[in-house]
UniProtKB/Swiss-Prot annotation:
A Gene Ontology biological process term: circadian rhythm
Modified residues (D-phenylalanine): F66
Secretion signal, residue range per the UniProt entry: 1-28
GO function terms (MF aspect): neuropeptide hormone activity
Gene Ontology annotations for the cellular component aspect, listed alphabetically: extracellular region
Major subcellular location class: secreted
Protein name: Crustacean hyperglycemic hormones
Any Pfam family matching the protein: Crust_neurohorm
Localization of this protein: Secreted
Length: 137
């Protein structure tokens, strides 16, 4: 009988806590960041279709670390580090066009900077920007 009362008390506590969290308006960071990312991606595109940039004559490989369009110094470690930001940003938003847009123009774009912000890498932004300048044009 004691274990039944303990279980019932535990269920009541869980329901009360869940109800108080649901009504307090707690939102995850990705909800806010997702809307910012959507606005950022839609503002740079002339088309309303989010994947319209994939129809260009260049095929995009999500797993490709080295971008042949980058005319700067080839450094595999820097490319992996920059690519990791885009990969983590993709994992945060789960939108394929976030990953591909993040890599455009040798990582020198506003989506890459937004990803640095959303991944809370603000304290090392200069290090990443230096890497972008090294591999960039």
């Amino acid at each position: 009988m004691v274990s039944f009362r303990t279980m019932w008390s535990l269920v009541v506590v869980v329901v009360v806590v869940a109800a108080s969290l649901g009504s307090s308006g707690v939102h995850g960071r990705s909800v806010e960041g997702s809307s910012r990312m959507e606005r950022l991606l839609s503002s740079g595109s002339s088309s309303s279709e989010p994947l319209s940039f994939l129809s260009q004559d260049q095929s995009v490989n999500k797993r490709q670390v080295f971008d042949q369009a980058c005319k700067g110094i080839y450094d595999r470690a820097i490319f992996k580090k920059l690519d990791r930001v885009c990969e983590d940003c993709y994992n945060l938003y789960r939108k394929p066009y976030v990953a591909t847009t993040c890599r455009q123009n040798c990582y020198a774009n506003s989506v890459f900077r937004q990803c640095l912000d959303d991944l809370l890498l603000i304290d090392v932004v200069d290090e990443y920007i230096s890497g972008v300048q090294t591999v960039g044009k």
